[in-house]
Amino acid sequence: MDSSTTIPITPTRTPCFFNISSSFNEHSPLNFYDEPIYNFSSGHEENQSHKSSKLTFFKPSNTKRSPHTPMQNNAKAIRLSTTVRHGIFKNSDLDGCSKPFAFSSGLKLSKKIVDASTPIDLKRKRAVTSLSTGLLSKREKWSLWEGNLTNPRSEQPHTPCKKGTKIKLKPPQSPLSPTTSLLARKCKHIDLDTFSRLDHPNSDSSDETFEMEELPSLSYGSEDLLEFCETPCKSQPIFLSSSHVNNWDEKDVPSSLSWTPTSPIFLNINSADDYEEEEDWTSDLRIRFQQVKPIHESDFSFVYHVSSINPPTETVYVVKMLKKNAAKFTGKERHLQEVSILQRLQACPFVVNLVNVWSYNDNIFLQLDYCENGDLSLFLSELGLLQVMDPFRVWKMLFQLTQALNFIHLLEFVHLDVKPSNVLITRDGNLKLGDFGLATSLPVSSMVDLEGDRVYIAPEILASHNYGKPADVYSLGLSMIEAATNVVLPENGVEWQRLRSGDYSNLPNLKDLLLSKEKVQINKVRCAESLQCLLQRMTHPYVDCRPTTQDLLAMPEMIFISEHSQKAAIIYEDHNSWLET
C-alpha cells in the first residue's frame, strides 16, 4: 500500500445525551461521560427492574459541543424494529447497568468540557475504539445521514469490478413533458426528481398519473461516458443532482431550444404490459393466500408477505416471485437452479426452508418460511447505535452460520452472496441463511459470471473468477467483522483495497474495546482475542490460508459454544468461563 495514500478523516462529532421519559427529570440528563453500560465483574451487579419506556434523544441547550462525542438528531428518535428487544441489552432491558439507562458511548472520555480549540493532551493515552479509526461506526453513519441528504459513500472512488454495468429493472415510467426536459437541460442546478413533482401549467392533476423515477442512463457526449469507459465497475445511475428549486420562470423555456442536449437519456427496458401482468400474478396470490402485502422489490424479484387461507390454522409465509423479465439477463436456468438448491437444503435448520414452488404465467413463485425479526443487517444497525456487540454473541452467530455453510459445501454448492442482509432472524432469535439467487454447484464453469455484493466479495472472484468454498468463508468473515467491531464496511476506495490485502490497521482491536471498560474478566479478553485471530484468518487474501467450514466447526471455541450456549444467537448471555473444562 502506498504510504502517501490519504486516510479518510472521521467527521467531527458533537455531544449527545440519552433520556428515558418518565424515569428521570429532564433537567438532570445522563451523559456519555458517565460509567459504561456494562460492569463485567461477577457478583457485583445490582438486580434492578425498570419499566419499559420510550427512548428519546435530546441535546441540552446549556452544554457545549465537543468534537469527540457522537451526536444524534434530536428531531428523530431511534426506532428499534426487532421484536426480540431483550437480546440487545444485558440481563434483559438494561438490568445490571451501573447507572440506569446510561448508555456507553464507546469512548472513554474525561469529564472536562473541550471544544475544537482545546489542545490535545499528549500524555494521556487515547483509547483505540471503533470511533477512532478511518472507518465509520454505525452511530457515526447514522449521524452523518441525518446531517447530509447525500450518501457519504458515493463520494469515494470506485472499486474496479469485472462488470461494466448493472441493468436495473423498473416499472414503466411516465415520460417527461417537453417543458421539464428543456428546463432540465438548461438549468444546471436543478434536481430532476424534485422538479418533476412541481405543479406545471399543463400538467395533469389526476391522481392516477405515475411519478417519474430515475432509470439507469448515460449522458452521451459528456464526461459521464468517458468516466464509464476509464473505470470498469458496477456503475450507479447517473442523474442530475443539485440544490432544490423553489421557483422558476416560464419565459426562460423557449431560449433553451437552441441548447445542445447533454442531460441524461432515460431508457425504459420494460414492456408496457408489466402492470397488467402484475395484476395477474397478484390475483393468483390472493386466490392461494389471504392478506397479500408487498414488502420488497429487487432487480430480479418481488417479495410478498402472505398468510394461509384457513383462519383456524393461519400461518405466515413469504412468497418470492422471480421476475420473468429478469430471466432475459440471468437466464431461466439460474432460477431453476435456485429452486433445486433450496429443495436440497431443506434438512438444514440454519437455511430458510422452502415450503412450496409453482409457476404462473412463466413467473416462478417460491413459498418460504417467514422470519419475524427481519435480517441481521437491520439488527446490527440498530444495535450499533447503542453499543458494540459482545464477542460471545458474535461467536454464537458465527457458529450457526458456519453450520449453514458447511451443510451447503458438503452438497458441493457455494452461496457466493453471504452478507448480513441475506441472514434472517427467526422469532426466537436464531439465524437462517437465505437468498440463493447466486448459489451454484461446484465446479463453477468458466463461462459463468457471478458477482455478489462488492462490500463482502472475496478478492479472488474479482481477480481471477475463482468461485469456490473459500469465497463464502471470506464473506462470512467480513460479515462477522462488521458485527464485532460496529464499523461500516467500505464499498470501495482505499479502505476497501486495504481489507482485501490483509491490512486491518484501521479496524478497532476487540481487546481494546473490552479494556476501555472497567472490571473486565480475563476470560472475556481471551474470548475477544481468539475471535479477532479467527476473523483475520477467514479474511486472508490467499485462498489456501483460510480455514474450511469443517476446520471452523472442529475448533475448541466452536465446540465450547455448542456445549455451553443456552440462548439464541442474538440474545445476550454471560459466561464466567471460556475454554475451561
Swiss-Prot record:
It catalyses: L-seryl-[protein] + ATP = O-phospho-L-seryl-[protein] + ADP + H(+); L-threonyl-[protein] + ATP = O-phospho-L-threonyl-[protein] + ADP + H(+). Residues 160-169 have a biased composition (Basic residues). The keyword Magnesium applies. The keyword Cell membrane does not apply. Its EC number is 2.7.11.1. Residues 289-561 form the Protein kinase domain. The active site is at 417 (proton acceptor). One of its GO terms (molecular function) is protein tyrosine kinase activity. It holds the Pfam family Pkinase. Keywords: ATP-binding, Cell cycle, Cell division, Kinase, Magnesium, Metal-binding, Mitosis, Nucleotide-binding, Serine/threonine-protein kinase, Transferase, Tyrosine-protein kinase. SUPFAM superfamilies: Protein kinase-like (PK-like). Mg(2+) binds at residues 422, 435. Residues 59-71 have a biased composition (Polar residues). Protein kinase that acts both on serines and on tyrosines. It acts as a negative regulator of entry into mitosis (G2 to M transition). Phosphorylates and inhibits cdc2. PANTHER family: EUKARYOTIC TRANSLATION INITIATION FACTOR 2-ALPHA KINASE EIF2-ALPHA KINASE -RELATED, MITOSIS INHIBITOR PROTEIN KINASE MIK1. This is Mitosis inhibitor protein kinase mik1. The lineage of its organism: Eukaryota, Fungi, Dikarya, Ascomycota, Taphrinomycotina.
